């Protein structure tokens, strides 16, 4: 099987239909861009008129749900087994969150959006101090907690079911509490196909718009002509860099690029802060944050029902639809890098840290731009923003003393954001089309990378980017229904998980007496200080634990239970007792490695020589952090019965 997976890990019912549907949609947008824009535009217009309330309510529910999960008893549950630890340090984690979630968007809209709201507010007169305050409130609202809540709820669903319940790390797993094993059938395939389409088309359209900003920056810096030909070359160059990043893997390629770009982003922001109206910007950040928090409930539910305007369809609904359509990609990427964190830690990190940085970025760039227009009278900046949002950032930076160097830094940042979006997008789509496999052949990632590049180039040549972007946002409506159902399923699963934890701690503490029986204290002491090798633990599992599991299984089968003893995984054994319609019981034992303390072994010895192993018990919810090495057969049977008794008590309470 291992050799087969080095050749291909694709899931045919998802891979092939996704490729065909992507080709069909791209051909429609390329061959008849005007017709495509009309069809998708009418769909979006219908949604704006008839379903705007649903979008607004759904995003509010997502935010409330993730906050509730963090502050409730569910917050202590880990995204993975109870013994798991985070795969990445906090800084690396934050850097990858930032790069995948908001990168190119911040560069594109950091100056443009606040200025556009300042000049043309949804209500009231533009170009005033009131309009300036309202512009920053709106910008904070669009880029703050709500956007990250959408990403967080998708990532929570995927990480919880994928890492804690060993389900595939794909969107189909979100429906497991609602439809059970049917996620592996046509319904699950359809969900994953939809996620592949949304991710490929979303990333491709973002790349198409992002390359326009790179072209604008190069035009300002080096007089590189602006045009489709140059942008196609830029896409090919960026995708070549993305290919190199993919070849080095998540732990090196994407992580290093993300950390580098976060440092560059902080540097650029600090330079603008220092060279701009520093005191005003610091005051504005504090006031903007206070105004945002004070108005968050009102803005969350504001549909301008008593002041009808087309503004909400072009801004708030556009953003909400885009965040939702973008969430399979970003949510899955966040889930991929968040294994081992508690729900409380996860929500705090995903909601507060990126949102806090984003709001600081918007203040430094947005308020600086508004200050230039409102106080310094630099009306040309407003005209440049209205003329071309891709050039807004560079028109803004050239007003500073080191404008050329700042613009050069900005171009590098946009390029790196471009690359991280492309390679993380290819990685996510590859996982979706491979049934959740985390380790897949390089050619599959390269295939999806080429598909996204070809899609972006084709749409760019045919002027079909806007049409497909509109289609992607319109597709968020049915996907929102799916997300609401999946969120309900997650809450249902968390309630059962928390109940099981409570029952386990309320029951009698686990007795170890079964394991020691009547053995002498000398033998027990020898077992405590023994530092077994892997081979010793494996032999113990094979000679003692496996027969104990088989004895329990045989007795339960006599009583009509469906029981399995799984010895297929190397060096481990697990006993599964089926409970149709209710959670199954799992008792497993496997070797777990530790490093011997320094007072026992020399630091100079080889790494392998310094390890010792324990025969640790694993239940459905993860490792239990106790060792049964050296126990007798009857002692192991007693431990199985103790754990099974607690499981049956949990099932009784949860009914």
Language model features by range: what are they?
Residues 6-13, 48-52, 82-100, 136-145, ...:
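Transmembrane-helix boundary/entry motifs in multi-pass membrane transporters
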Residues 2-6, 38-44, 71-90, 115-138, ...:
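Flexible loop linkers connecting adjacent transmembrane helices
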Residues 5-16, 20-30, 63-68, 102-106, ...:
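Helix-loop-helix module between adjacent transmembrane segments
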Residues 2-8, 32-47, 67-87, 135-142, ...:
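Membrane-water interface regions at transmembrane-helix termini and the short interhelical loops
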Residues 2-131:
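N-terminal alpha-helical transmembrane segments of multi-pass membrane transport
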Residues 17-31, 56-63, 222-250, 267, ...:
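Transmembrane alpha-helical segments of multi-pass small-molecule transport proteins
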């Amino acid at each position: 099987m291992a050799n087969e997976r080095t050749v291909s890990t694709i899931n045919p019912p998802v891979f092939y239909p996704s490729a065909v549907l992507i080709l069909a949609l791209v051909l429609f947008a390329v061959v008849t861009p005007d017709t495509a824009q009309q069809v998708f535009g009418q769909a979006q217009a219908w949604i704006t008129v008839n379903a705007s309330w649903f979008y607004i309510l759904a995003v509010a529910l997502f935010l409330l749900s993730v906050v509730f999960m963090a502050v409730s008893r569910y917050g202590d549950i880990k995204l993975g087994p109870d013994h798991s630890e985070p795969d990445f340090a906090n800084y690396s984690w934050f850097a990858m969150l930032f790069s995948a979630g908001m990168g190119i968007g911040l560069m594109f809209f950091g100056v443009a959006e606040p200025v556009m709201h300042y000049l043309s507010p949804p209500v009231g007169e533009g170009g005033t101090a009131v309009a300036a305050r309202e512009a920053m409130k709106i910008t904070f609202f669009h880029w703050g907690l709500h956007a990250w809540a959408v990403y967080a709820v998708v990532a929570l669903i995927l990480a919880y079911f994928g890492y804690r319940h060993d389900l595939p790390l794909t969107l189909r797993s979100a429906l497991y509490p609602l439809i059970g094993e049917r996620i592996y059938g046509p319904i699950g395939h359809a969900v994953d196909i939809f996620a592949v389409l949304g991710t490929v088309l979303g990333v491709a359209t973002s790349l198409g718009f992002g390359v326009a900003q790179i072209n604008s920056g190069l035009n300002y810096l080096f007089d590189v002509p602006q045009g489709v030909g140059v942008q196609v070359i830029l896409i090919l160059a960026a995708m070549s860099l993305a290919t190199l990043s993919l070849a080095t893997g998540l732990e090196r390629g994407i992580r290093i690029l993300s950390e580098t770009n976060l440092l560059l982003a902080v540097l650029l922001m600090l330079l603008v802060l220092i060279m701009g109206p520093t005191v005003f910007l610091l005051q504005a950040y504090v006031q903007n944050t206070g105004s945002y928090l004070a108005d968050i409930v009102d803005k969350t539910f504001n549909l301008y029902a008593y002041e009808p305007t087309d503004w909400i369809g072009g801004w708030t609904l556009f953003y909400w639809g885009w965040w939702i359509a973008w969430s399979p990609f970003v949510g899955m990427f966040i889930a991929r890098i968040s294994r081992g964190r508690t729900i409380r830690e996860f929500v705090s990190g995903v909601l507060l840290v990126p949102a806090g940085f984003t709001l600081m970025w918007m203040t430094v760039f947005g308020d600086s731009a508004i200050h230039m227009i409102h106080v310094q009278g630099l009306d040309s900046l407003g005209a440049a923003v209205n003329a071309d949002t891709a050039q807004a950032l560079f028109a803004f930076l050239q007003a500073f003393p080191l404008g050329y160097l700042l613009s050069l830094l900005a171009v590098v940042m946009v390029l790196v954001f471009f690359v991280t979006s492309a390679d993380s997008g290819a990685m996510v789509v590859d996982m979706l089309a491979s049934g959740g496999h985390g380790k897949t052949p390089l050619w599959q990632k390269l295939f999806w990378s080429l598909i996204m590049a070809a899609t972006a180039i084709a749409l760019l040549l045919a002027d079909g980017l806007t049409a497909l972007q509109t289609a992607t946002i319109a597709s968020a409506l049915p996907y929102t229904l799916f997300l609401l159902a999946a969120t309900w399923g997650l809450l249902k699963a968390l309630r059962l998980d928390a109940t099981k934890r409570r029952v386990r701690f309320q029951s009698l503490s686990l007795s170890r007496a079964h394991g020691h029986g009547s053995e002498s204290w000398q033998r027990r002491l020898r077992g405590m200080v023994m530092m077994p090798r892997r081979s010793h633990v494996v032999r113990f599992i094979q000679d003692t634990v496996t027969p104990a599991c088989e004895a329990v299984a045989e007795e339960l089968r006599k009583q009509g239970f469906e029981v399995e003893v799984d010895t297929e995984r190397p060096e481990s054994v697990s006993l599964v007792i089926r409970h149709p319609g209710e959670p199954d019981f799992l008792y497993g034992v496997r070797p777990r490695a530790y490093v011997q303390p320094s007072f026992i072994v020399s630091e100079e010895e080889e790494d392998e020589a310094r390890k010792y192993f324990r025969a640790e018990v694993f239940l459905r919810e993860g490792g239990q952090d106790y060792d049964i090495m050296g126990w007798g057969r009857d002692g192991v049977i007693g431990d199985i019965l103790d754990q099974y008794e607690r499981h049956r008590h949990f099932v009784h309470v949860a009914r």
